[in-house]
């Protein structure tokens, strides 16, 4: 039996493939390569010595989904596919909804037709909006989102919850990520955004490698210890391992299940800059600019539920996040483009 990984050539997807293959799972990947590269799948093979079966296509395409389910014995789906960056999605709400929401509906419909009853969904802490309670637990209010990306994730969560009620055989696991950073320790796979990065760590590392002249710090007047936004940063390998734990716990475990995946510790933008400088001996020039629409002051998790119910907790600290980020970037200054 195989696991279908949508968006498997992307940043989190490729790291999850490595961990799945290390456990000898059979993997099928569907990715449209709109914000990823097939080179990442070649690198995954270099790391693990194992291949995945790859289909290039879109989750909106029912024909390719039916082909995948017909040609492979799929028992579960890990669903990463969708537009990711807060910045890009604020400019085109319709495209965000079409890809992230409609695509997820199509995927789940075709899963159910094929009698595939387990899905692990890549959600986000952005569903909490501007949280009134810190640290954030899973029972905190959701839906007061501040950008289209968060809204799309919230909508898919609600759709999955309602689908479980309509199709009680379905096991839907929602993983609410906090801010993923770092790269595989080999330096072969990592985050490779198109254009100017929207996320902090690739922005920092591209300044370090000389691709960008300075870091833009979005907002210096938040109510935090240094005026910059505070987030919960989690190593991407720890995040990947959380998917394996969720899948093992809830395979064919009918119901709707929600977990935060974070460290439980918040760091500011300037904390992260200083940590990168200390870990790698590189100075990062920066300039404080206007706040980015949709950003909030503070967001970090209470990850106890994942520890208690999944047996999952983070193992990689801030220094390793910084070293692994730089190891990836310095060895791949142009990402997967050569």
From Swiss-Prot:
Record-listed E.C. numbers: 5.1.3.2
Query: What are the recorded Gene Ontology BP terms?
Result: galactose metabolic process
Question: Gene Ontology cellular component?
Answer: cytosol
**Keyword Transferase belongs to the record:** no
**Which positions form S-S bridges?**
none
Q: Which InterPro entries match?
A: Epimerase_deHydtase, NAD(P)-bd_dom_sf, UDP_G4E
Q: Which CDD domains match?
A: UDP_G4E_1_SDR_e
TM segments?
none
User: Which reaction equation describes what this protein catalyses?
Assistant: UDP-alpha-D-glucose = UDP-alpha-D-galactose
Q: Which cofactor does it need?
A: NAD(+)
Q: Which residues bind NAD(+)?
A: 11-12, 31-36, 58-59, 80-84, 99, 124, 149, 153, 178
Please report which protein family the annotation says this sequence is part of.
Answer: Belongs to the NAD(P)-dependent epimerase/dehydratase family.
Chain's role: Involved in the metabolism of galactose. Catalyzes the conversion of UDP-galactose (UDP-Gal) to UDP-glucose (UDP-Glc) through a mechanism involving the transient reduction of NAD.
Subunit text: Homodimer.
Task: Fetch the PANTHER family from UniProt.
Answer: UDP-GLUCOSE 4-EPIMERASE (PTHR43725:SF47)
| Protein name listed in UniProt | UDP-glucose 4-epimerase
Organism of origin is: Mannheimia haemolytica
Q: What lineage is this protein's organism placed in?
A: Bacteria, Pseudomonadati, Pseudomonadota, Gammaproteobacteria, Pasteurellales
């Amino acid at each position: 039996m195989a696991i279908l990984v949508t968006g498997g050539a992307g940043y989190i997807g490729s790291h999850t493939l490595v961990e799945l293959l290390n456990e000898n799972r059979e993997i099928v990947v569907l990715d449209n390569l709109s914000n990823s590269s097939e080179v990442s799948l070649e690198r995954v093979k270099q790391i693990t010595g194992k291949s995945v079966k790859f289909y290039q296509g879109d989750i909106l395409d029912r024909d390719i989904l039916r082909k995948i389910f017909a040609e492979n014995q799929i028992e579960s789906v890990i669903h990463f596919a969708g537009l990711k960056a807060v910045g890009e999605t604020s400019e085109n709400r319709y495209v965000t909804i079409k890809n992230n929401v409609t695509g997820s509906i199509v995927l789940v419909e075709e899963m159910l037709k094929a009698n595939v009853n387990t899905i692990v969904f890549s959600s986000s802490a952005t569903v909490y909006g501007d949280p009134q309670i810190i640290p954030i637990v899973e029972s905190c209010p959701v839906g007061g989102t501040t950008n289209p990306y968060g809204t799309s994730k919230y909508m898919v969560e609600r759709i999955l919850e309602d689908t479980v009620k309509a199709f009680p055989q379905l096991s839907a696991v929602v993983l609410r990520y906090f801010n993923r950073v770092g790269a595989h320790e080999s330096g072969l796979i990592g985050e490779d955004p198109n254009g100017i990065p929207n996320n902090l760590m690739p922005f920092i590392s591209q300044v370090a490698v000389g691709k960008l002249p300075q870091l833009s710090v979005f907002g210096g007047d938040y109510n935090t210890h240094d005026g910059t936004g505070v987030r919960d940063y989690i190593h991407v390998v720890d995040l990947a391992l959380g998917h394996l734990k969720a899948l093992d716990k809830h395979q064919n475990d009918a119901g709707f299940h929600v977990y935060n995946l974070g460290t439980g510790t918040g760091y500011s933008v300037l904390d992260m800059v200083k940590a990168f400088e200390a870990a790698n001996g590189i100075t990062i020039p920066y300039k404080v600019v206007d706040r980015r629409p949709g950003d909030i002051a503070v967001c970090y998790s209470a990850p106890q539920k994942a520890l208690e119910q999944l047996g999952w907790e983070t193992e990689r600290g801030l220094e390793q996040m910084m070293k692994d980020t730089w190891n990836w970037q310095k060895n791949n200054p142009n990402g997967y483009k050569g």
